[in-house]
């Protein structure tokens, strides 16, 4: 099939065929795909001519011969065709990844398993274009992505408002607009899931070069990881990787049915499924057991196994069990004293080998309560290697604003606000904080703070959110530091005319909001 759409920019690529023992190399995707098509035709036709049993014929006919792959389609040849053409596309992405890596003299190659470099995702269906009035389908992802790019390049500008020319996304159900066709082209990748680069070593695919290079930098040796998270002590090679990581410590989402807050939409979905839904879609075929996720079902299926699925890994111990619960119970009863205690109470310094035991101790001995909306305690590793109770929780300014706005809007969640963590808002200023290489520790804050950029003697506005429910059921303080954007004047030390809500609104619009 000839490649539709516009020919991509010329690249000095070394596209090497890895079908069986083939050593063909070329630099153009058109020639490369045409060559691989010949392999496919010979493979499918040749297998059909062999006089073998039907079962052996099917197994041979739909097996991929690409090196380090091992894919076999039990259904039909169309799955194999899409799969092999994806190898062509993947080969190009790995070449672009090699070029990107060679342009970074300070980076070493990926150190992950080389044998996974040709493992690609399952392609169950045709690549279908959902641009309005189109719906063309493709077996080759290279032609599909070129076709979608052609839509973006042919899209006409439209006048919206006064002197505003924009291009509209024509993808089914999308209403986004963009200032130019280049931005539209980038946006379309969110619809097609197109990747633009792959790791030449492990084969991982990425949406842009930045994410690919981050993949390499995360493998840096410890002596090159100079940026440390003050909340969990993980280290990173660049400040941007540290900032990306820190966002996972900040809660941006609140459950509409309780006070639980969490950092990710996936965390909220899991919480809703486990805490507020009675649905148990995962059912055992051997008995009446049902559960809420696949992991629990797999654990249960182990109990139906004739052979023990778990064995004790302590030296000279031959205990085995069919369930994870039984093996954990064995560890607790027999070997708990053999392990070094890693969990330490921050109140009385008593040590425990398991987090469960520390949880029971905190609740019974010190009358600690779980944070409102949360079903358990979280423990954090400290510099001495012990895991202690995490006393600090970070809530985003946007979430704070949402919670404050709910009673004013008459929301049904207003009642939950009275029981939530937010109880009082105070706006004040503090002097400049230490630079990014230093750690700022809040006195009386119950935990470490995140390193902050120097403010050069100016005051930065801080919003103190007084939480009603910390681990002990007492008030704790969450600190929000709002930074001005580079090149903009520093924020005023007095509250704006809009009061606290005005400051919160401004914070939500700031390009960078960091927490301490």
UniProtKB/Swiss-Prot annotation:
GO BP term, example: negative regulation of DNA-templated transcription
Lineage top rank: taxon: Eukaryota
Chain positions covered by the region annotation Interaction with NPAT: 371-516
GO cellular component terms listed in the entry, alphabetical order: nucleus
Region (Disordered): 429-456, 486-516
Biased composition (Acidic residues): 436-445
Zinc finger residue extent: C2H2-type: 15-39, 127-151, 167-191, 197-219, 227-249, 253-276, 282-304, 310-335, 343-366
Keywords: Activator, DNA-binding, Metal-binding, Nucleus, Repeat, Repressor, Transcription, Transcription regulation, Ubl conjugation, Zinc, Zinc-finger
Any GO molecular function: RNA polymerase II cis-regulatory region sequence-specific DNA binding
Subcellular localization(s) per the UniProt record: Nucleus
Database matches in InterPro entries: Znf_C2H2_sf, Znf_C2H2_type, ZnF_E-box_Homeobox
SMART domains: ZnF_C2H2
UniProt keyword ATP-binding, yes or no: no
Post-translational modification: Ubiquitinated. Ubiquitination may lead to proteasome-mediated degradation.
Record flagged with keyword Metal-binding: yes
Subunit structure of this chain's protein: Binds MBD2 and a histone deacetylase complex. Interacts with NPAT.
Function statement: Transcriptional repressor that binds to the consensus sequence 5'-CGGACGTT-3' and to the RB1 promoter. Transcriptional activator that promotes histone H4 gene transcription at the G1/S phase transition in conjunction with NPAT. Also activates transcription of the ATM and PRKDC genes. Autoregulates its expression by associating with its own promoter.
Protein name: Histone H4 transcription factor
UniProt source species: Bos taurus
Upper taxonomic lineage: Eukaryota, Metazoa, Chordata, Craniata, Vertebrata
Gene: HINFP
């Amino acid at each position: 099939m000839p490649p539709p759409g516009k020919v991509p920019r010329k690249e000095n690529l070394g596209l090497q065929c890895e079908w069986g023992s083939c050593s063909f190399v070329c630099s153009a995707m058109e020639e490369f795909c045409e060559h691989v098509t010949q392999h496919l035709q010979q493979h499918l036709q040749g297998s059909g001519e062999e006089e073998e049993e039907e079962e052996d014929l099917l197994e041979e006919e739909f097996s991929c011969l690409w090196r380090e792959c091992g894919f076999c389609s039990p259904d039909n040849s169309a799955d194999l065709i899409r799969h092999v053409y994806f190898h062509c596309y993947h080969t190009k992405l790995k070449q672009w990844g090699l070029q990107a890596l060679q342009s970074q003299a300070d980076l070493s190659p990926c150190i992950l398993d080389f044998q996974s470099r040709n493992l690609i995702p399952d392609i169950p269906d045709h690549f279908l274009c959902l641009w309005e009035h189109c719906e063309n389908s493709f077996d080759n992802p290279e032609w599909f992505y070129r076709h979608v790019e052609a839509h973006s390049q042919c899209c006409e500008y439209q006048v919206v408002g006064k002197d505003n020319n924009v291009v509209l996304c024509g993808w089914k159900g999308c209403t986004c607009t963009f200032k130019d066709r280049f931005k539209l082209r980038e946006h379309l990748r969110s619809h097609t899931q197109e990747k633009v680069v792959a790791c030449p070593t492990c084969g991982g695919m990425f949406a842009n070069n930045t994410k690919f290079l981050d993949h390499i930098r995360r493998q840096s040796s410890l002596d090159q990881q100079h940026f440390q998270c003050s909340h969990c002590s993980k280290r990173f090679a660049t400040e941007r990787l540290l900032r990306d990581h820190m966002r996972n410590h900040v809660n941006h989402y609140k459950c509409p049915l309780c006070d639980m807050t969490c950092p990710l939409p996936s965390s909220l979905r899991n919480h809703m499924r486990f805490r507020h839904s009675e649905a148990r879609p995962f059912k055992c075929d051997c008995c009446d057991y049902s559960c809420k996720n696949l992991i629990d079902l797999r654990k249960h299926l182990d109990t139906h196994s004739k052979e023990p699925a778990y064995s004790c890994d302590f030296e000279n111990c031959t205990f085995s069990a069919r369930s994870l619960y039984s093996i954990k119970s064995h560890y607790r009863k027999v070997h708990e004293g053999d392990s070094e205690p890693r969990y330490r109470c921050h109140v009385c310094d008593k040590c425990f080998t398991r987090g469960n035991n520390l949880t029971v101790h905190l609740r019974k001995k010190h009358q600690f309560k779980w944070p409102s909306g949360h079903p358990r305690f979280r423990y954090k590793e400290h510099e001495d290697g012990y895991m202690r109770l995490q006393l600090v929780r970070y809530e985003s300014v946007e979430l704070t604003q949402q919670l404050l706005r709910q009673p004013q809007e008459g929301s049904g969640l207003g009642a939950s606000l009275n029981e939530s963590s937010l109880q009082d808002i105070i706006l004040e200023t503090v002097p400049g904080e230490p630079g990014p290489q230093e750690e700022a520790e809040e006195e009386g804050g119950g935990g470490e703070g995140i390193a902050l950029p120097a403010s050069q003697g100016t005051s930065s506005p801080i919003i103190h959110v007084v939480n009603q429910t910390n681990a002990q059921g007492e008030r704790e303080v969450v600190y929000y530091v709002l930074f001005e954007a580079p090149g903009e004047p520093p924020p005023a030390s007095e509250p704006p005319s809009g009061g606290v809500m005005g400051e919160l609104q401004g914070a939500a619009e700031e390009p960078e909001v960091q927490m301490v």
